A protein has these predicted regions:
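Walker A/P-loop
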Residues: 37-78, 90
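Conserved NTP-binding/hydrolysis module of P-loop NTPases
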Residues: 80-96
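Hydrophobic anchor at the beta1->P-loop junction of P-loop NTPases
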Residues: 48, 115-116
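Short beta-strand-centered segment that lines the nucleotide-binding/catalytic pocket of NTP-utilizing
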Residues: 70-83, 142-147
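Canonical AAA+ ATPase core
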Residues: 92-95, 118-129, 134-215, 221-226
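Pre-Walker A (pre-P-loop) alpha-helix and adjacent loop at the N terminus of AAA/AAA+ ATPase modules
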Residues: 8-51
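Conserved alpha-helical scaffold flanking the Walker A/P-loop in AAA+ ATPase domains
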Residues: 35-38, 92-115
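Short loop/turn elements that form and flank the Walker-type P-loop nucleotide-binding site
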Residues: 34, 41-43, 67, 108-110, ...
Length: 229
C-alpha cells in the first residue's frame, strides 16, 4: 500500500475517533488510551499493570468494540495447560467425546483482541505458547496451521500475590511493545464519578456507548506497514 498525505490524515482522524469512542466508557485514563492506540496501529502487544478495579478489562473491551472483530479473554491459573488455549474436550449428553476449538482458535481470523488475565499465574509452558502466537500470529494444531493475523494480545500481571505465580522472563517481556501501568485516577471529580455515578457501575451499559467497528480492522496491518515505511 502506497501512503499519501490524504490517506495518512484519514487514518489519523480514525485513530482520534477510536480514542474518543473508548473515552466514552473510560474516565481518567487518557494516557493509557493513547498508548494502547499507538500499540494497536504499530501492531504491538501490551502488558498491563494496575490495581484491581482500575478498569483493565473494561478498557480492552471498549477497544475491542470500537475496533471490531472478536474479543477473547483467558484467566491465568496454575492448572491451565497449553492445550487449553487450543482446544476444549468434553463428553456430550450422549456419552460421546467431543473436541471444540479453544479460545485461540474459535474465532478464526476475526480474533482481534486477546486478553490474558494474570499471565504470571499460568505455567511457563502456557506462557511460551502464547508468546509464540504473539510473535507469529499463528499456532499449529491438528496437523495444520491456524492464523489470526489481526490479533493484538494484552496481558496483565498479578503484582499482589506471589504464591503459585510464574514471573515472566525478561525475554518474554520483550515480546510486548509496552508495559503500561494503569494508575488509580487521582482527580477528585473523576473519583467521585466512578464511585457515585451509577452509569459507571454497569460495564455492559457503558460499552453500549462505544460505537462498534469505527475503523476497518482488516486494514490495520496494511496501514501499519505503510506508516512504518
Amino acid at each position: 500500500m502506497r501512503i499519501s498525505a490524504e490517506l495518512l490524515q484519514d487514518w489519523r482522524n480514525r485513530a482520534l475517533r477510536l480514542e474518543e469512542e473508548v473515552g466514552k466508557a473510560i474516565l481518567g485514563q487518557q494516557e493509557t488510551i493513547r498508548l494502547i492506540n499507538v500499540a494497536l496501529f504499530a501492531r504491538g502487544h501490551v502488558l498491563l499493570e494496575g490495581d484491581v478495579g482500575v478498569g483493565k478489562t473494561t478498557i480492552l473491551r471498549a477497544f475491542a468494540r470500537a475496533v471490531g472483530g472478536d474479543f477473547e479473554r483467558v484467566e491465568g491459573t496454575v492448572d491451565l495447560m497449553p492445550g487449553d488455549l487450543i482446544y476444549h474436550t468434553y463428553v456430550d449428553a450422549g456419552g460421546t467425546p467431543r473436541i471444540e476449538p479453544g479460545p485461540l482458535l474459535r474465532h478464526g481470523e476475526r480474533l482481534t483482541t486477546f486478553f490474558f488475565n494474570e499471565i504470571n499465574r499460568a505455567r511457563p509452558q502456557v506462557q511460551s505458547l502464547l508468546l509464540r502466537a504473539m510473535a507469529e500470529r499463528s499456532v499449529s494444531a491438528f496437523n495444520r496451521e491456524y492464523r489470526f493475523p489481526f490479533m493484538s494480545v494484552f496481558a496483565d500481571r498479578n503484582r499482589v500475590e506471589k504464591e503459585e505465580t510464574f514471573e515472566l522472563a525478561s525475554a518474554a517481556r520483550d515480546r510486548f511493545m509496552f508495559e503500561l501501568r494503569m494508575p488509580t485516577p487521582s482527580e477528585t471529580g473523576v473519583r467521585r464519578a466512578l464511585v457515585f455515578n451509577p452509569d459507571y457501575h454497569d460495564v455492559d451499559a457503558l460499552l453500549e456507548r462505544v460505537t462498534a467497528e469505527v475503523i476497518p480492522w482488516r486494514d490495520l496491518n496494511d496501514i501499519s506497514a505503510a506508516i512504518q515505511r
